[in-house]
Amino acid sequence: MAGSRSIFEEVQDSQKPAAMPGGVSRDRGRGRARVRVFIMILFVMVVVQIAIGGLTRLTDSGLSITEWAPITGAIPPLDEAAWEAELEAYRATTEYQEQNRGMSLAEFKVIYWWEWGHRQWARFLGVVWAVGFVGLLATKSVPVGWTGRLLLLGVLGGLQGVAGWWMVHSGLAPGMFDVASYRLAVHLGLAFLILGLMAWYILRLGRAEAELMTARRDGDRMLAGMATGLLHLTALQILIGALVAGIDAGRNYIDWPLMAGAFTPPDMWAIEPWYRNLFENDGTVQFFHRVTGYLLFVIGVAAWIMARRSARTATKRAFDWMAVMLFGQIVLGIMTVMHSSPWYLAIVHQFGAVVLITLILRARFLARYPLPQSVRGAA
């Protein structure tokens, strides 16, 4: 009969697995850091693209290139004959015939370079994404579960290029002076969707998955829910802002808080059928942009007051900055309207939307995944 064996018998040293202290976590940490830096680069590039797009619209340059050539369009006109051909194509548009008739080649080049620059930066952004994505895959730097997220950013970027041409094409139709406002809203909304996803990914990658799982147990669901509602309302406000920009609604009704001496603008529902007023009536569109701004302020203040009761200092500070930016963005919007939407205020107001939605996402993230805090830090 075999001898008895203690259940506490030690395993011989030769049987023990080789220890690799911290090896796996270090590799995962490096991968998360690399992906995070990559997305940060893309985030900055998208912010620049939104600014270029805004200036392209404000300079009325968006219809200067009348064809969509994703590859060959990267090369601009190289001689006088090529420039004349581009100008001749632009002369066929309603915008030229009704607004820019007689435009010189030198004047045309200014608006052409704005639109070409906007498209070229988009191409560059696509190349950076593709090279970075392939490089991260080749070096096995992508953490588990993140390949699909990175691929999603690329797919949305490609879809954004298609949406951009879909928008421009609407402005090239006979009788159109500008792009369709609802298509502009789709184009801008998609840009902010991409930007928001990138911001959220950057926040998540800044901490280990295990830490996030632990932090979520201590999260404030009600406060995170308030931030989520504020995020959705801000997204709606950005879309309405795009409609305002698309029909130049910000240049009319420059009094505040009233509109032409009343709370609602005159002829608010003058266009038939009624729903077209929501897209085409400058007074109606601006009215809803104002009202949504007021609602944002109320909900934002409520979220800030709720955050003041949080024991987490970092969470409270995040909502402080969000509230400051929300107030600043509203003031900036009022100034933009009262000055009849000059280009420099309009572009700053658009950039303010980028900052605001990023700060809302950060506040939501810290409400959902609070940072660890000592008793002394909470005092």
From Swiss-Prot:
One of its GO terms (biological process) is heme A biosynthetic process. Its cofactor is heme b. Its EC number is 1.17.99.9. It is an enzyme of class 1 (oxidoreductase). The chain crosses the membrane at residues 35-55, 124-144, 150-170, 183-203, 227-247, 287-307, 318-338, 341-361. Keywords: Cell membrane, Heme biosynthesis, Iron, Membrane, Metal-binding, Oxidoreductase, Transmembrane, Transmembrane helix. Residues 1-28 are annotated as: Disordered. It comes from the Bacteria. Its main location: membrane. It is found in: Cell membrane. Heme binds at H289, H349. GO terms for cellular component: plasma membrane. GO terms for molecular function: metal ion binding; oxidoreductase activity, acting on NAD(P)H, heme protein as acceptor. It is a multi-pass membrane protein. InterPro entries: COX15/CtaA_fam, HemA_synt_rhodobact, HemeA_Synthase_type2. Pfam families: COX15-CtaA. Pathway: Porphyrin-containing compound metabolism; heme A biosynthesis; heme A from heme O: step 1/1. It catalyses: Fe(II)-heme o + 2 A + H2O = Fe(II)-heme a + 2 AH2. The keyword Cell membrane applies. Belongs to the COX15/CtaA family. Type 2 subfamily. Catalyzes the conversion of heme O to heme A by two successive hydroxylations of the methyl group at C8. The first hydroxylation forms heme I, the second hydroxylation results in an unstable dihydroxymethyl group, which spontaneously dehydrates, resulting in the formyl group of heme A. Interacts with CtaB. This is Heme A synthase. It comes from Jannaschia sp. (strain CCS1).
